[in-house]
From Swiss-Prot:
GO terms for molecular function: serine-type endopeptidase inhibitor activity. Inhibits trypsin activity and prophenoloxidase (PPO) activation, an enzyme essential for both clotting and insect innate immune responses. It does not inhibit activity of chymotrypsin and protease K, and has no effect on phenoloxidase (PO) activity. This is U-reduvitoxin-Pr21. The keyword Repeat applies.
Length: 139
């Protein structure tokens, strides 16, 4: 019971501490690396945006050089032995797949006319050049 009360008190204290601060006070940012200033309203305001040690990637590179790894931007350290990188989630680009096939028209048709393929599986439209654009569907 005492432990539960202590934990409840600690959580309330942490929540209150996180929401309010002394105006003008310098506070360590949640990342443990950057610093923030407390606003006149007692809230955490502007913070520094330094690259933090936990964001370092060990590598040999040209000191001060900026480069990309996937979608993240990195800058090489002064020593040229590590780089500080942003930590964005990079989604791999999928190759573009065509949803239609351009093929010789199966029949004489008027440009803009829609029809079903002979196998009755694909929807097609006649184009001005005499070819057809048909959906790519496996039957």
């Amino acid at each position: 019971m005492k432990t539960a009360l202590f934990l409840l008190f600690a959580l309330v204290f942490i929540a209150v501490e996180a929401r309010f601060c002394t105006p003008g006070q310098r506070i360590r940012a949640p990342d443990g690396c950057n610093w923030c200033r407390c606003t006149k309203g007692g809230r955490i305001g502007g913070c520094t945006k330094m690259f933090c040690r936990k964001n370092l990637v060990k590598m040999d590179c040209k000191p001060g050089k900026k480069f990309k790894i996937d979608c993240n931007t990195c800058i090489c350290s002064k020593e040229g032995k590590a780089a500080a990188c942003t930590q964005k989630l990079c989604l791999k680009k999928r190759p573009k797949r065509s949803l239609i096939n351009i093929e010789k028209s199966e029949r004489n048709c008027k440009p803009g006319q829609n029809y079903m393929s002979k196998d009755r599986c694909k929807k097609c439209v006649c184009m001005k050049d005499g070819n057809s654009a048909c959906t790519k569907v496996k039957c």
